[in-house]
Amino acid sequence: MLSLRVACLILSLASTVWTADTGTTSEFIEAGGDIRGPRIVERQPSQCKETDWPFCSDEDWNHKCPSGCRMKGLIDEANQDFTNRINKLKNSLFDFQKNNKDSNSLTRNIMEYLRGDFANANNFDNTFGQVSEDLRRRIQILKRKVIEKAQQIQVLQKDVRDQLIDMKRLEVDIDIKIRSCKGSCSRSVSREINLKDYEGQQKQLEQVIAKDLLPAKDRQYLPAIKMSPVPDLVPGSFKSQLQEGPPEWKALTEMRQMRMELERPGKDGASRGDLPGDSRGDSATRGPGSKIENPMTPGHGGSGYWRPGSSGSGSDGNWGSGTTGSDDTGTWGAGSSRPSSGSGNLKPSNPDWGEFSEFGGSSSPATRKEYHTGKLVTSKGDKELLIGNEKVTSTGTSTTRRSCSKTITKTVLGNDGHREVVKEVVTSDDGSDCGDGMDLGLTHSFSGRLDELSRMHPELGSFYDSRFGSLTSNFKEFGSKTSDSDIFTDIENPSSHVPEFSSSSKTSTVRKQVTKSYKMADEAASEAHQEGDTRTTKRGRARTMRDCDDVLQTHPSGAQNGIFSIKLPGSSKIFSVYCDQETSLGGWLLIQQRMDGSLNFNRTWQDYKRGFGSLNDKGEGEFWLGNDYLHLLTLRGSVLRVELEDWAGKEAYAEYHFRVGSEAEGYALQVSSYQGTAGDALMEGSVEEGTEYTSHSNMQFSTFDRDADQWEENCAEVYGGGWWYNSCQAANLNGIYYPGGTYDPRNNSPYEIENGVLWVPFRGADYSLWAVRMKIRPLVGQ
């Protein structure tokens, strides 16, 4: 029985296994045979349960591998990854666009703000330059006034000292006369003199005089601030990138930067021979490898040349002068006042701008007028003062002056046949063309005095103030009194002359109505107004200065050093000079200069008479102004200033009251009242050699071809250079230029003698100075 049970169990198990292998169980279950009630079913996240997929062979790839479930999973995973990356890129792009827009807006605002700052900075720079220049000018004026007042105080101190000495001398004289009266005077007059009081006052006064009221030497030159834009602030490569960049960045190309430099007028940064980069063009021995710079042949970038009588920057418009009339016509020239041979009319003493009224009047027959003018032809460039007939090859300014004259002959008959004949002839001294459009002016007649015109025309009273001066001469066109007008350059010619004759038994009246515009040589405009029978002409003209002090007071650019045109009283010639307005009171006219030995000063009498050499507009060069000019410039007395500088940079000066005689007097030298630090070489001379043999005062001028010295031989021939020799010299600024300073006279040929550029009291006779200058200015009070 037990074995049967075991066999049944084995059969049951075998059937169960067989059912599972053949799928009958599944069918059975599907048929509902395994239903045992509700059961919990777990949802699988994916039907792809297998993760370990076998490798696919080539033949199994299409129909068996890979699994679709596996492919779907890989595709979904890659799609999700790409989607995340794209979203991240989109978010980054949106952020960058927003930031870019914000940065562009901020950049634009910043550049606009900076553009305004740049404009304000440029305005501030310009304002600062103007204010500093105005301040410097005011300080210069104040300094000049202080120096002038200090000199006046010194003069007053000397006057007080002289008066004190005179009072003391007078006291002594009175005491002597009282003591000499032995009669009743000795019994009735009791007088005591206290000389100690005078001595005490004199000592106190000497202490006051000993105080130096003038500014120190180191404060003599007032520095100037020079502002100039910096070129190429942005390099070229960056500038091209800015041009191609956004519009807001182009504001950087408009940015300007100013360079500010502090300059000292009259002083160079390296003005000594032992300093590198010497800019003054000195001789070859001043430094190794240096080269003499000849001012007659300037190098690249040097200044041009300017001949005397020319007109350029820094000078007024010059005009030809010297009109000539008939025997009964008043004659006058520019810048002077002299009576005519007939009526004695005078030119206005101050020929500034003014207003003139012309009234009709009776005319006399056979009235002749002659006008003269000068025509300038100027080319651009720098200017240089050229003295004498020195030939200069340069690309600078060249000026040609053409002198032209216009003669008008006018004839008016009486009532028995009215006839008016006007003949005009224009001639030139050198045969040059004066131009068809040139108008030499008109002749204006005046009734009454010019000071009455300001009362007649109060609305035009500004023309009669102190700026333009008062014109007090009387002018009449017809009759025995006539005068000539200024010289004008016609710019417009709408004039109409309408003669009107009135019937009369004795006289003929001519009325003119003229409307004409003129322009002067310095481009000053003037107008002519027509009012019935009265013609009023407002004129302008350039006032010609007579010296550098006049230039300092009246010229718009007179406070700066430079070349100016002047015209001496009593002379019709206009010539150019160099004015030094920085030294002392200013107004110094340079008459001689030595600075590099480039010019030979051993010249003839005629050379020294006319002058020779050249200067550029910076005052560099060697020259002699001319003895004729020295005589005319010092007629009324002048102050001579001699400035000396040795090769070590030591400076000294000497000042004298100065006058040069005429050629008939041998250009005799008259000096007095020495002041300075160089020593008195012109009056006292050399003490060792003897004052009577070496003093230059009252000596005539001598050259190698005209001996006027006190020596038995010719000093000018032995020592070289024209000078006021005695027997022979204690000073000779026109001697031989020896580079280096000290020289051995034994090496000189043909004469073994001290013939350098010397001032014996300063550095001795065997020392040739590096730079010397002679300047003159009018005496104070003239």
Curated annotation (Swiss-Prot):
GO cellular component terms attached to this protein's record: blood microparticle; cell cortex; cell surface; external side of plasma membrane; extracellular space; fibrinogen complex; platelet alpha granule; synapse
UniProt-annotated stretches for the region Disordered: 264-374, 522-542
Signal sequence residues: 1-19
Residue numbers binding Ca(2+): 707, 709, 711, 713
Example GO biological process: response to toxic substance
Main location: secreted
Top-level taxon of origin: Eukaryota
Glycosylation: residue positions: 602
Disulphide-bridged cysteine pairs: 404-434, 715-728
Skewed-composition ranges (Gly residues): 311-323
Biased composition (Low complexity): 324-344, 354-364
GO molecular function terms attached to this record: metal ion binding; protein-macromolecule adaptor activity; signaling receptor binding; structural molecule activity
Domain Fibrinogen C-terminal: 539-780
Residue ranges with Basic and acidic residues bias: 264-283, 522-536
Keyword Acetylation: no
PROSITE patterns membership: FIBRINOGEN_C_1, FIBRINOGEN_C_2
Post-translational modification: Conversion of fibrinogen to fibrin is triggered by thrombin, which cleaves fibrinopeptides A and B from alpha and beta chains, and thus exposes the N-terminal polymerization sites responsible for the formation of the soft clot. The soft clot is converted into the hard clot by factor XIIIA which catalyzes the epsilon-(gamma-glutamyl)lysine cross-linking between gamma chains (stronger) and between alpha chains (weaker) of different monomers.
Coiled coil: 68-547
Record keywords, A-Z: Adaptive immunity, Blood coagulation, Calcium, Coiled coil, Disulfide bond, Glycoprotein, Hemostasis, Hydroxylation, Immunity, Innate immunity, Metal-binding, Phosphoprotein, Secreted, Signal
Subunit structure: Heterohexamer; disulfide linked. Contains 2 sets of 3 non-identical chains (alpha, beta and gamma). The 2 heterotrimers are in head to head conformation with the N-termini in a small central domain.
Domain notes: A long coiled coil structure formed by 3 polypeptide chains connects the central nodule to the C-terminal domains (distal nodules). The long C-terminal ends of the alpha chains fold back, contributing a fourth strand to the coiled coil structure.
PANTHER family: FIBRINOGEN ALPHA CHAIN
Protein name according to UniProt: Fibrinogen alpha chain
Species, as recorded: Rattus norvegicus (Rat)
Gene: Fga
